[in-house]
Amino acid sequence: MTHQRHRREVVARLLRARRIGTQEELLEALRAGGIEATQATLSRDLAQLGARRVSRPEGGTVYELPAGAAERDGLATLRGLVSEVASNASLVVIRTHPGSAPAIARAIDLAGLPDVLGTIAGDDTIFVAPAGELRARKLATRLADLLGAPVAGEGPAQ
């Protein structure tokens, strides 16, 4: 896992676990966990995660992750169970360890990814139908990144 990905996962966990209202509070929490970051880096991380500040009824604001963020993080917990992600012009195929496909397909469905129309899972293979006119190759690359798996013909995912 890259340092950037690890930091973003920690930021997401902190935002789900605590009421954090400022980037300074978040920087302090990261530093307490041994992670150094600049305000500019943290700002980019928050934007990448889709975090936004929302007003609280009792006053003040807190950072909040968009709906589905926890489910997308759930996909990351399934890393290591996916062997490969491949695609053709209209379909993405995910190859998994035996018995893992149903759980991974369910996690993809629960993640609420707007690029995914739906999934069908067997024992070790998942068919993923892209939504709309999205090219299957782009979706394959995105799923491979979320699941930490290589895209067929491209080598290991970063």
UniProtKB/Swiss-Prot annotation:
One annotated Gene Ontology cellular component of this protein: cytoplasm
Subcellular location(s) per record: Cytoplasm
Entry's Gene Ontology BP terms: L-arginine biosynthetic process; protein complex oligomerization; regulation of arginine biosynthetic process
The organism's place on the tree of life at top rank: Bacteria
Annotated GO MF terms: arginine binding; DNA binding; DNA-binding transcription factor activity
Protein keywords: Amino-acid biosynthesis, Arginine biosynthesis, Cytoplasm, DNA-binding, Repressor, Transcription, Transcription regulation
Pathway involvement of the protein, from the record: Amino-acid biosynthesis; L-arginine biosynthesis [regulation]
Heme keyword on record: no
Disulfide bonds: none
Family to which the UniProt record says this protein belongs: Belongs to the ArgR family.
Function: Regulates arginine biosynthesis genes.
Protein name: Arginine repressor
Originating species: Anaeromyxobacter sp. (strain Fw109-5)
